Amino acid sequence: MTNLIIFLFPIRKKSQRFEFKGYKLNAVTKNWQSYDNLYRMTCRALKSRIQDFDVKELSGGFFSAVYLIEADERKVILKIGPNRDVRIMRHELEYIPTEAEMLHKLRNIDILIPKLITLDDSGEICNEPYFFMSFIEGTPLSETEVTGYELDAIKYQVGRITRQICSNPAPYFAVPGLPASITTRNSRFVLTLVKWLLDDAAEKQISIPFIKPTELLNFIDSYSHTLDEAIPCYAHTDTWDGNLLIKDGKLNGLIDFAAILYADPLMSHDFHDFNAKPLDSFLRGYGKTSFTENEMIRIQIYRIWQRLGMIVERGYRCYDDSNIYAWVLDKFVKEVKKMKALGYINRLL
């Protein structure tokens, strides 16, 4: 048992952070609007005829067009879904309505998140759904220099927030807004997520390194009993450094709630991010500092799912920089090798 734990979670002293400084992440999914449209959308949302109006495209984010809007001295954020003619991944089909719904549902939780102002899916001004939310001051952690002490405090807070989100039970496992994903079994849900990614990859002829799709699905299916130990809750699967807003060295806000799933709490991002193991500071904040063997197996499966998603995403976004986060290919292979070794170890036990 000890060897298995060391194999899955080797010790690493420092947080491994991936930064995107200097990038303007322009993707085909970003549905930029004209100045006139933005003005009309804002007047409708704020229910006033605005006199002083200014807009700024925000360069962060990997999916939606996002604007910082100043309207008569009020700052708000506008987020717009992709044009319907743009092909997006299966799990992304309801991203904008889902994020608006999650902001509304989580509004009474004591965490630092934007407040939903309005969702408009009428198509009367903009051809796709969009929503306005409150502005939170701060710079993404991915673009901020912090001390080791500050980073520990930030990740501790992320752990506390993650626990608060996960404390909300979900009625079933699902991608919110996508009925085809609904199931009462976590194993069926995880297989659906992975199969959707593999189908998305096949349709765009995106190569998945080192492992055949059927082999990956069969391996995950072989751990159905382990996956099915999970109980569904709200799980934020994208609390990476780019979604953490920092002010004066402290966490001042968490953004991007489109990636909340009804899922295993261990599917929350910081359990399976790019560190060799979950950070101690995060785990202390979450209130869980040890794992059973089955929990570690589930985390390992989620590490592969998360990296697979990034590989497929690169082929759908068509970023200006075609090599952006190409490093994830090697990370995926590394996790698959761990998975294969894990299967071999278990056959010997």
Describe these PLM feature segments.
Residues 229-235, 240-300:
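Active-site Asp-x-Gly
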Residues 300-312:
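Hydrophobic alpha-helical segments that form the core
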Residues 34-51, 124, 144, 156, ...:
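An alpha-helical support segment within catalytic cores of ATP-dependent transferases
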Residues 8, 18-27, 343-349:
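Phosphate/pyrophosphate-binding loops and the adjoining catalytic core of nucleotide-dependent enzymes
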Residues 315-330:
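Hydrophobic/aromatic-rich alpha-helical bundle segments in the mid-to-C-terminal region
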Residues 56-188:
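ATP-binding pocket architecture of kinase catalytic cores
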Residues 13-14:
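Polybasic, lysine-rich low-complexity intrinsically disordered segments
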